[in-house]
C-alpha cells in the first residue's frame, strides 16, 4: 500500500538568480517519493535587511533552508538565524568551494553570481526577477500592463514559485490572489499587454497543502474553512467564474510540476503573440 504524500517547506536563499539552488534542492527532494517540497525561492538576497525579511517568511512556514550567499557576513547571519530557530540549514556551495580551495591552493574570489555571463540575457532575467518580486501576491496592482504574464488564483495554487520560475527565464510575471467575493483589480481587467492565466487545482490538493502549512505554523489562528473542501470548492468556482467571464485561460496545477506549469504558460504566450 502506497503511503500518502506529505509536504514540507523548502526555502532557497540566493544572492543571484537561484537556479543553482533550485537544481540542488530538486535533485535531493526527488529521492523522497512520498514527500513533496513546497518551494520558496528568494533570489537577489544581498543585504541584511533582505535576509531579515526572508526569515519573517520562514518563521511562518519553517522547513529546510538551502542557500548560496558568497558574502560571509550574510552567510553567518543566515546560519545564526537557523540555529536560533532550530532549523536545518546548508550552504550548498561551501563544501565545493572548500575542495577547490584545497586542491588549487587559493581561496575563492567570492564574486556574487560569478557563474553567470553578464550579457544582455542575464540582465533581462535580473530585471524580470526584480519586477516579479515587486509584484508578488497582489503588490503594486496598478502596474499590471508592465507585466508579460499575470497569474491569478486562490491561495496555494503555486502562483509565487511559478512566477519566479518564469522570471528566471526573463518573463516579467506578476501574481494576484483571488479571494472569494472580492473583485479582481480594475487595472488587471483593463490591462492589454500581459497574458493573464488562472491557476486552479483540485480541492483535495489545495486542502492537503494548506493543512501542511498549518502544521508548520501552529501559532497562528487559521479559519476552519481554510482547509474545508466544500469551502475550497466555492473559492475555485469563484476563480473559474472570473476567468470565464474575462476569457482568461486556466491551467490545472494539481498534477503538474512548476516546470510543467511554466511550460504550458510559455506555450500559451506563443499562441497569443
Swiss-Prot record:
Disulfide bonds: none annotated. PANTHER family: PYRUVATE, PHOSPHATE DIKINASE REGULATORY PROTEIN 1, CHLOROPLASTIC. It catalyses: N(tele)-phospho-L-histidyl/L-threonyl-[pyruvate, phosphate dikinase] + ADP = N(tele)-phospho-L-histidyl/O-phospho-L-threonyl-[pyruvate, phosphate dikinase] + AMP + H(+); N(tele)-phospho-L-histidyl/O-phospho-L-threonyl-[pyruvate, phosphate dikinase] + phosphate + H(+) = N(tele)-phospho-L-histidyl/L-threonyl-[pyruvate, phosphate dikinase] + diphosphate. Its EC number is 2.7.11.32, 2.7.4.27. Bifunctional serine/threonine kinase and phosphorylase involved in the regulation of the pyruvate, phosphate dikinase (PPDK) by catalyzing its phosphorylation/dephosphorylation. Belongs to the pyruvate, phosphate/water dikinase regulatory protein family. PDRP subfamily. One of its GO terms (molecular function) is ADP binding. Pfam families: Kinase-PPPase (PF03618). InterPro entries: Kinase-pyrophosphorylase, PPDK_reg. It comes from Mesorhizobium japonicum (strain LMG 29417 / CECT 9101 / MAFF 303099) (Mesorhizobium loti (strain MAFF 303099)). Keywords: Kinase, Nucleotide-binding, Serine/threonine-protein kinase, Transferase. ADP binds at residues 153-160. This is Putative pyruvate, phosphate dikinase regulatory protein. The keyword Transferase applies.
